[in-house]
Amino acid sequence: LTALLALKDDHIQLQQLIAAKDVYGVTASGDIPLDIFRSQEQRKNPNAQMNIVVDLDNARLGILPAMTKLVEWGVGETKGKIRVAGTLEEPLLYGSVKIADGSVKVKHLNTVLDAINLDVVFNGNMINLKNLSTKLGKGLLKAEGSYALNTSLDSGYSLHIVADKAQLASQLFTGTINGDVLIEPQKYPDFKNHKGSGEPKMLFRPLVKGQVRLDDVLVNMPTVPELDEGESNIGLDMKLELGPKIHLYNSYLYDIWLKGGINIKGSTLFPTIEGTIKADKGKITYLRTDFKLDNAGLVWVEPGSFLPNVS
């Protein structure tokens, strides 16, 4: 990372900024008024705005390993420029970024994200994800949506994700995913912090709704995960369906075949779950002793918890 700056007439002149790895790089240049670092009441020019242009034409996906340890390698060209305007309180972005036929290898995931196509348009306050798609095995994962930098929470974002026979392979999970999921704001009554009489205050939280089907799955977890309820408040309206050949297998812990499905509503703070996950055959190993399963099932009797009861 190298930068060349100059201070003149109460402005920072960003003459050149380069973030590079090997032959890949992101460049930026422009003007930053010092006024935007002052409170609005103390600004000499109340209309002061940034004007910085970020050039991604030479970035390429090969720069991703330098930006995050989650990516092992990337191949593919990036095209686009983004102009950063506005203030720190209300930034504005203009321009577009496109990727055509790229590939990325994510760490701990054996499946390569292939044929990556991206089309993002920045229009001031609004970021529009017109298309993001990638091949996963013989299937496809795609998404579209929008995000507002400054707006009311009832319309600030939307993300639509579709998985069409998407195939994932990793050490923990291998299988085929079909799904249609929408993430958008949800209005809800804040009973948790409500005091006294009257109606509770209405707030907004993310809502995840849709359906997901799993087929030909092999799950191999060396330890049983802890189901912590957490503090995040996310609305839920999801249907999970298990297709044939859902296999949980670890040579030291379990060998179980599952089927069934559940509907999850409510929120991550207080879920309500209907349905049954059945295990018609299998075994659990504990202290080197095998316990055979015969027509066991997981049901959720009490609302407000992700922990099931075993029947």
Residue ranges and their predicted role:
Residues L1-T27, P33-K44, M50, L61-I63, ...:
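Strand-loop-strand
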Residues V53:
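Structured alpha-helical
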